[in-house]
Structure formats: C-alpha cells, structure tokens
C-alpha cells in the first residue's frame, strides 16, 4: 500500500482549516495544533466523506461531532500544559505502541523546542520531563544548526530559558514574516533526509555556489528576525503616537483601533506584547476590517450593499497583575465577536457598533482594579550587607528556569550611589548603566540613558536607591564575579 501525503503551509500566522486548499482526492485531513473549534469545516469535510483528525491543545467551547478530536483541554488528561507538539508526540507514542516500533522519541528535541516556544508551564512533571529529555539529545539538523549559530549566547549551556530567548524567536519570526519559500526551507531543514542536502546558495556574493539547506535556513531566520524587529519598532513608534493623541491610557484596557494605519497582522501579537509590558495593562491591538454586506428587497433580490466594519487583531493580558484571564473577561462581556486562543494571548474581534460600549463596560467593571505592577522577589538583600557568592549561586541554576518556574528576582535595598561607583558605558551607541557595590557585585542596566545616569547624581554627593533584577555571573580569565 502506498501512502500519498500532502502538506500545506499557511501564508501567515493563521490557524485552522482552509477548505479551498484541500485537494479533492484527500480522504484524511490531519490538523496539528489547531482546528478544535473549526466546527463548520469539520462538517463540510465529513459530508464529502473526508475524515478529520485534530491533535490540539487550544480551548474550545465543545467537542466537534464531525471530527476525531485529541485535545488535552477537552478531556480529563491531567497534563494541561502539553502544547500542540506535545499532543502530537503523545499520539505518535501511542502509534508506536500499537505497531511495536519506537520512532516518537527520535523527535523529542523538536518536542522540547515546540513546547518552549509555546511557553508551556514547566511546573508540570511530564512537560518538564519531555523538555529535559529533548534538550539532552539535540539531533535535529535545524535545531543543531541554530545551537551552533547561537553558541556565544548559549555559552552557559542549553536550557529552556536559553532556547526561549535565542532560538525559538527565530522560528517564530520566520513563520510570521518569512516568504513561503523561506518557510519551506525552514521546515525541510528540520527533516533528517533533507536538512544536509546541498542547494543553490542565496548568500550574498556566493552566486553559483552551494550550501546545505540547514545553513540557508539558519541564515534566513537571522535575516528575517532582523527585518521583523525593524518593522515592529517602526509600527510601535506610530502606535504610541496614536495612544498619546487619543488619550487611550484613560481607559482600563488599552484598546487601540488602527484606522488610518494598519499593523501587519503577523506582528500584532508581538506589538501587543511590547505595549502590554510598557503600559502595564491589558492590550487590544485591532486593525480595521471592512466587509460588504448585501441588502435584499422583499422578493429576495439584492439591491445594494452596506459596509460592515469590525476591529480585529490581538489581545494580551497583563501577567504581573491579578487580572489573570483576559479571554474570559472578553467572553463574559458578550460584546465581542470572538476571543480565541489562550487566557492572556489571543485573537480578538469586535464590531464597530459594540466598541464604545465595550470600552465603557470594561472601565466600569475594572473601575477599582489596580494594574500597578507587583514584583514578587525571592530574596531581599541590603546594599552593604550581602555576599556576592549568593548571586553567583543563583546564576548557576539557570538551567532550571522557564515558563511557570520563573527566574528568581532579587531586590537590593539601600544602595548608596556616588560619583565613584556609577558609570554610563557606551553613552552614544548603547548606553549601559553600571553600579559597582562594595563587595564587587556589578549592577548592570542595558538600554539606559544620559538622563537616567544624571538622575543618580546629587548635589549632596550621594543618593540611595533600591533595585530589582536577575542574577548573572561574569567569567573572565577564570575569575567569576557577580
């Protein structure tokens, strides 16, 4: 028996089934990490005699009657933190058991990469175990290639937090911003039998030469990530002007309607994250969507069309406040078209007619809610009375941290600042503030400014500050300093 397998790649960061892209001769559609709530598409395919298998982890209102749904959120399976890739691994493991083979574990490195990228909770034993096993034996061509490329940033070892910062964002950027060809190169570089194939080089100055698919994929991802960062920063500048001009910070939820300016739909989630972190409140970043709605006469004849306006985009909850479920809040308002995804990272749509009503509703419902950030610290030290070795010991535990097992925050209080212990390094290019404590501990703040540096000077010669930060260690010529 010969199996004919087709696969398709979304043109952007869409989710779910797009019926027009499914060939007529297909008998089984497999939907990983999506489609639990594509009820109409399930029914349409079922009526054509096409079976649908959904392997997913997203929340849905009900279980589809027209598809086979494997979803840890819709049953009593205890590990709710397995993402789509984790659920696919569980499915493959069961297939191994049925067929008396052992293939699934060969892909544990990709399982780890996927679950880290999807920010799954490492407090669950099964999730932690799968990620640990996957990172212990990285054999996937692309994953290995990116580890080599990011070797300086990962010099302390391969950990969940290292992968989350230095590898996962490059995959994410390619999915959001890459061309179809660039995405295909990326996914094919993850295949054992294709990753190391020689293909025509696209590197500048190397026309006519060849390189492996992995080499090209890793370089592409870096270039795309740089493009994404530039596009994100440019959009942020425009959006922040809109926020100021329209006084949107007067509202409890920062809901931004992009009327004359449209943000790239593949960037709205990233931009919403940045806005949420800066303004410290839930964010809705919404593009204008205009649809033509037909108008019929009494005989059912179309006589004209009306413009239907809605606002659609990304929502982000503020994770440092007690407002811990933006999706639930939106649904309970009964004023949104949809709020789909995770509790605090989701897609949102609202009609133009309901928008002002929703703003008034949220302002009233959250009138007494304080979004002031609360930093829960694990240690409180005093500026002249702690051991630098404590900072080093915490820094050496970096392999443990990840989503749900957050890297410890440390507060240091009563730090005396004077001209002799503070300096602004690289003030013109990348201003970095450095404060040196009596015990040799260095306090470093990147992306500082001349203004911030000058605030640390006093006419009396000394000021006192408190800081909150994370622990790092510096190794130079074999000497370790906090």
PLM feature spans:
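Beta-strand/loop nucleic-acid-binding surfaces
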Residues: 440-458
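Glycine-rich, acidic loop segments that terminate in or are immediately followed by a histidine
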Residues: 43, 177-181, 237, 247-383
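OB-fold single-stranded nucleic acid-binding module
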Residues: 346, 354-359, 384, 453-455, ...
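A structured phosphate/pyrophosphate-recognition subdomain
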Residues: 59, 63-249, 289-307, 334, ...
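N-terminal small/polar loop signature for handling phosphorylated ligands or for N-terminal nucleophile
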Residues: 1-64, 75, 237, 241, ...
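General beta-strand structural signal in soluble alpha/beta enzymes
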Residues: 7-9, 30-32, 53-57, 69-71, ...
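Divalent metal-coordination and catalytic microenvironments
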Residues: 28-30, 56, 88, 118, ...
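Accessory interdomain/linker segments of ATP-dependent helicases and helicase-like nucleic-acid enzymes
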Residues: 381-441, 447
């Amino acid at each position: 028996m010969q199996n004919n397998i087709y696969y398709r790649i979304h043109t952007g960061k869409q989710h779910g089934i797009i019926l027009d892209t499914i060939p007529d001769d297909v008998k089984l559609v497999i939907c990983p990490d999506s489609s639990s709530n594509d009820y109409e598409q399930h029914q349409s395919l079922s009526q054509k005699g096409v079976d649908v298998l959904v392997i997913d982890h997203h929340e849905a209102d009900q279980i589809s009657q027209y598809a086979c749904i494997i979803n840890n959120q819709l049953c009593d399976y205890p590990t709710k933190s397995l993402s789509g890739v984790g659920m696919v691994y569980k499915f493959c493991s069961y297939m191994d058991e049925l067929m008396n083979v052992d293939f699934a574990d060969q892909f544990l490195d990709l399982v780890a990469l996927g679950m880290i990228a999807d920010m799954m909770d490492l407090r669950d034993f099964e999730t932690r175990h799968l990620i640990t096993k996957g990172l212990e034996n990285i054999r996937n061509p692309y994953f290995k290639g990116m580890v080599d490329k990011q070797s300086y940033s990962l010099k302390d070892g391969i950990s969940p937090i290292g992968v989350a910062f230095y590898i996962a964002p490059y995959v994410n950027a390619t999915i959001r911003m890459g061309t179809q060809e660039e995405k295909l190169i990326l996914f094919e570089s993850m295949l054992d039998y294709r990753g190391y194939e020689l293909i025509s080089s696209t590197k500048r100055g190397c026309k006519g030469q060849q390189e492996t698919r992995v080499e090209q994929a890793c370089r592409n991802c870096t270039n795309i990530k740089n493009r994404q960062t530039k596009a994100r920063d440019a959009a942020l500048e425009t959006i922040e002007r809109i926020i100021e001009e329209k006084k949107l910070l007067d509202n409890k939820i920062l809901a931004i309607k992009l009327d004359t300016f449209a943000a790239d739909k593949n960037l709205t989630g990233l931009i919403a994250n940045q806005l949420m972190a800066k303004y410290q409140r839930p964010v809705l970043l919404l593009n204008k969507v205009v649809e033509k709605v037909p108008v019929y006469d009494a005989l059912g004849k179309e006589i004209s069309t009306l413009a239907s306006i809605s606002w659609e985009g990304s929502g982000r909850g503020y994770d440092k406040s007690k407002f811990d479920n933006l999706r639930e809040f939106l649904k309970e308002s009964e004023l949104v078209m949809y709020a789909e995804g995770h509790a605090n990272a989701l897609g949102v749509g609202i009609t133009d007619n309901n928008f002002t009503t929703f703003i008034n509703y949220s302002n009233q419902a959250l009138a007494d809610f304080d979004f002031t950030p609360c930093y829960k610290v694990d240690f409180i030290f005093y500026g002249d009375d702690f051991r630098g070795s404590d900072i080093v010991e915490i820094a050496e535990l970096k392999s443990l941290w990840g989503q749900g097992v957050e890297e410890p925050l440390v507060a240091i209080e009563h730090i005396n600042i004077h001209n002799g212990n503070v300096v602004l390094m690289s003030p013109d290019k990348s201003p970095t503030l450095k404060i040196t404590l009596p015990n040799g501990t260095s306090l470093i703040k990147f992306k500082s400014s001349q203004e911030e540096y000058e605030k640390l000077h006093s006419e009396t010669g000394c000021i006192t500050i408190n800081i909150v930060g994370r622990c790092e260690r510096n190794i130079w010529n074999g000497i370790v300093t906090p």
